[in-house]
Amino acid sequence: EDLPHVDAATNPIAQSLHYIEDANASERNPVTKTELPGSEQFCHNCSFIQADSGAWRPCTLYPGYTVSEDGWCLSWAHKTA
């Protein structure tokens, strides 16, 4: 099943969590959380991501949608092994 991509402009959850699709090209929260600085925080290394690979992956914070592996939001939490 192909899920739609979350739209930061229209999705209220994405808006409240300041989701950005490309964290490399956007300004984001520079605060260091855990051991990673803001510049190293992405959806692909977040504990909420639900797949190990893919450019767009399901996220527990955005039910029914996928997020960009290079995205970021305020709820980012470091994914541990």
Swiss-Prot record:
Keyword Iron: yes
Lineage: superkingdom: Bacteria
GO MF annotations in UniProt: 4 iron, 4 sulfur cluster binding; electron transfer activity; metal ion binding
PROSITE patterns the UniProt entry points to: HIPIP (PS51373)
Record key words, sorted: 4Fe-4S, Electron transport, Iron, Iron-sulfur, Metal-binding, Transport
InterPro entries: High_potential_FeS_prot, HIPIP_sf
A single BP term in Gene Ontology: aerobic electron transport chain
Electron transport among keywords: yes
Pfam families noted in UniProt: HIPIP
Transmembrane segments: none
Amino-acid positions noted as binding [4Fe-4S] cluster in the UniProt annotation, renumbered to this chain: 43, 46, 59, 73
Coiled coil feature spans: none
Function summary: Specific class of high-redox-potential 4Fe-4S ferredoxins. Functions in anaerobic electron transport in most purple and in some other photosynthetic bacteria and in at least one genus (Paracoccus) of halophilic, denitrifying bacteria.
Similarity-based family: Belongs to the high-potential iron-sulfur protein (HiPIP) family.
Subunit structure and binding partners: Homodimer.
Protein name: High-potential iron-sulfur protein
Gene: hip
